[in-house]
């Protein structure tokens, strides 16, 4: 049976002091979550060490917001798996729509990050998703197929999370209909060819829509942005019914 993975991506938010305060409020709220799910948070790199000092790893794990495909070298602004594992990081987000957009990350680069994350002992959370223009032109399935086939080449599906994040729904307040998201997640599962691969939905996930999203047959979790910054909101999402 697939475990649900509820992940929060803090993006460029939260200082070390903010992180300490957040966790002091958040951890008691998730102490009794069911054992059919995992909770993951991706803080900014500067807060990872603070985060690791205040986290109970029985029910909450750390993710990085990106990862490089080399252990070390002249790669300014990048971070390696070894640097992260030292601070108890277990997951790594790769291919998020923001690096794709702002830094022109290609499917090939995303694939290199994902493959190296796995070989280093981390579980990659690989993001895929279409723009509004692509969706309106009826190209969503084609775009997702390309991103999955190229971005996940040579990865191990048993140590993989794929996050479907329609770009037009990220931070906009617009949510993809749960049934539509479920169809795309089913497509992703069929493309990977491994029924137990964990597939998340991301895009304006909030306390008032989490229960419907998580009721879908092919959605195994969520990748949450803004709502993960509030410990009350994120605890409600983590404790979905």
Curated annotation (Swiss-Prot):
It comes from the Bacteria. Keywords: Cytoplasm, Gluconeogenesis, Glycolysis, Isomerase. It is an enzyme of class 5 (isomerase). One of its GO terms (biological process) is glycolytic process. Its EC number is 5.3.1.1. One of its GO terms (cellular component) is cytosol. It catalyses: D-glyceraldehyde 3-phosphate = dihydroxyacetone phosphate. It is found in: Cytoplasm. Substrate binds at residues 9-11, 171, 204, 225-226. Gene3D superfamilies: Aldolase class I. Its main location: cytoplasm. Pfam families: TIM. Homodimer. This is Triosephosphate isomerase. It comes from Prochlorococcus marinus subsp. pastoris (strain CCMP1986 / NIES-2087 / MED4).
């Amino acid at each position: 049976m697939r475990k649900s993975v509820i992940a929060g991506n803090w993006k460029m938010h939260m200082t070390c002091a903010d992180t300490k305060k957040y966790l002091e409020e958040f951890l008691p709220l998730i102490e009794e979550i069911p054992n059919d799910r995992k909770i993951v948070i991706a803080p900014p790199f500067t807060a990872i060490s603070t985060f690791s000092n205040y986290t109970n790893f029985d029910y909450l794990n750390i993710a990085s917001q990106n990862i490089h495909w080399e252990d070390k070298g002249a790669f300014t602004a990048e971070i390696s798996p070894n640097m992260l594992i030292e601070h108890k990081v277990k997951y790594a987000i790769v291919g998020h729509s923001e690096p794709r957009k702002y830094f022109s990350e290609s499917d090939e680069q995303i694939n290199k990050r994902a493959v190296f994350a796995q070989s280093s002992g981390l579980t990659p959370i690989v993001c895929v998703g279409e723009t509004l223009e692509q969706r309106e032109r009826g190209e969503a399935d084609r775009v997702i197929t390309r991103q999955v086939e190229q971005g996940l080449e040579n990865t191990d599906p048993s140590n993989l999370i794929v996050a479907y994040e329609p770009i037009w729904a990220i931070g906009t307040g617009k949510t993809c209909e749960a049934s539509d998201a479920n169809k795309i997640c089913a497509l992703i599962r069929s493309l990977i060819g491994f029924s137990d691969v964990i597939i998340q939905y991301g895009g304006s996930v909030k306390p008032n829509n989490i229960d419907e999203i998580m009721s879908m047959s092919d959605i195994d979790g969520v990748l949450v942005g803004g709502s993960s910054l509030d410990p009350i909101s994120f605890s409600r999402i983590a404790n979905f019914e």
